[in-house]
Amino acid sequence: MAKEIILGIDLGTTNSVVAIIENQKPVVLENPNGKRTTPSVVAFKNNEEIVGDAAKRQLETNPEAIASIKRLMGTDKTVRANERDYKPEEISAKILAYLKEYAEKKIGHKVTKAVITVPAYFDNAQREATKNAGKIAGLQVERIINEPTAAALAFGLDKTEKEMKVLVYDLGGGTFDVSVLELSGGTFEVLSTSGDNHLGGDDWDNEIVNWLVKKIKEVYDFDPKSDKMALTRLKEEAEKTKINLSNQSVSTVSLPFLGMGKNGPINVELELKRSEFEKMTAHLIDRTRKPIVDALKQAKIEASDLDEVLLVGGSTRMPAVQSMIEHTLNKKPNRSINPDEVVAIGAAIQGGVLAGEISDVLLLDVTPLTLGIETLGGIATPLIPRNTTIPVTKSQIFSTAEDNQTEVTISVVQGERQLAADNKMLGRFNLSGIEAAPRGLPQIEVSFSIDVNGITTVSAKDKKTGKEQTITIKNTSTLSEEEINKMIQEAEENREADALKKDKIETTVRAEGLINQLEKSITDQGEKIDPKQKELLEKQIQELKDLLKEDKTDELKLKLDQIEAAAQSFAQATAQQANTSESDPKADDSNTIDAEIKQD
């Protein structure tokens, strides 16, 4: 019986790679064209599906050639081709099926399992879409892992005993990511992520294309943009030129018979110096600098704390990129691993771990933003803080906001702001059938669970009746890495203002709760209360109501402290008078949070 093989797949925006573990070592598989990377492009022509290199060559000439489909994963958008609409996961599935097919030919038997990588900032919807793409392609996706984690895994395979902090600089074809990880005893933990979802190697290619168009117009009096085939050749030559300039100081651009001019065929022969190229792309290099600083800040470490800097993505071969990294971090980046293949290698290693081929390696990823629920007053109460290691499950006891409330609404939010309205709403569901009781008595356990693939499940359970409701968060919209970083930055900028708002809301909720409690005591105790005590209670209630109207938080806090102390003395006296040791069930439960779930 053939040994189980789990494919390691880097499903990239621009290119994809597949690798396996062979004799306990990772091996990258070549496609039918003898290349180790395959363009993530699908084209349709005459009812025929074309994937990879051949499809890429049709990008400018065939309107039904589809690239960068990864950007649409997890959305409800579709692409039109072959006289029908395709969902993003259907197109991704065709790329995966192509990788699976040529992998099986290399291996010699069928393969049904895979580990697929995704950007660290991919949300639930994007991860689910990736799993679905694998399923459509005939693959059981054993694990979804973050790309920087995969890169660190590839790097750390033989160094599992050494503790180190690593920065992964990932400049892909269409996206840019920076991650800081901690490696220790075979464990890989993501400490932070940052980046730019709309920056990649393609932008450097486009700068060369723009330069070529301008030069060809000047020298040959010909506009290559007027000819789709000429533009396709220009883009191919631009990529080659970028690659050449990573290894040499000058590159010759040779494009014979690019088109027809006034005096016959246009034969282009131009030279581009590395110094010119670096000057025209300096602004792109600068755009990658800030995410490096941000990632270090989020991880709460200095550049001097880094043991290694890893490069991912073919564009990291550019000397200007390496020079900027070294200058920014005062450390030479590690160039010992192939930047095009490292992510797929890491995925293959994880596949080897799952198949039992490799041991002593443990992966720990983190959630990029805080997850919580909306509680009374619009407060965002966190359950799983940002950068919590996954998989994870966390629970908290909440209660009702109104007397005899039989239903609560659980609103799940994501973000760093202290008020729910300022964060992203992920989902909402109702828990019905709660036994009618005074506010604060029912115990509702809210649990958040994030699995190894980063998929979030939220449940709410009434501990007395056993009624339970559960949802899996599947976002209809996605968060780009820029949006994640923006949310973190906004939370930092608004921290003081948000804290004041939260303090005001919490004080108001506290006052309203005390008013409710005191009024209930007067009603329940009735004639048993000493008239003077009753008069004092009513006076205190009115004072609280007046301060609530006046919007004076500090004064309200002082009054609350005074009245709560008096109320406690009153409660003790009443208890002694009634000769009972019975106490407030809520007060005895140290696990019940002092914030009720908002009632819709």
Curated annotation (Swiss-Prot):
Q: Where is this region: Disordered?
A: 570-600
Q: Any keyword ATP-binding?
A: yes
Q: Which UniProt keywords apply?
A: ATP-binding, Chaperone, Nucleotide-binding, Phosphoprotein, Stress response
Induction, as annotated: By stress conditions e.g. heat shock.
The protein's matches in InterPro entries, at most eight in alphabetical order, are given as: ATPase_NBD, Chaperone_DnaK, Heat_shock_70_CS, HSP70_C_sf, HSP70_peptide-bd_sf, Hsp_70_fam
Q: Where is the composition biased (Basic and acidic residues)?
A: 583-600
Q: Which CDD domains match?
A: ASKHA_NBD_HSP70_DnaK-like (cd10234)
> GO MF terms on file?
ATP binding; ATP-dependent protein folding chaperone; unfolded protein binding
Modified sites of kind Phosphothreonine: T175
Relate the protein's function as given in its record: Acts as a chaperone.
Q: Which family does it belong to?
A: Belongs to the heat shock protein 70 family.
Please identify the protein, giving its name as recorded: Chaperone protein DnaK
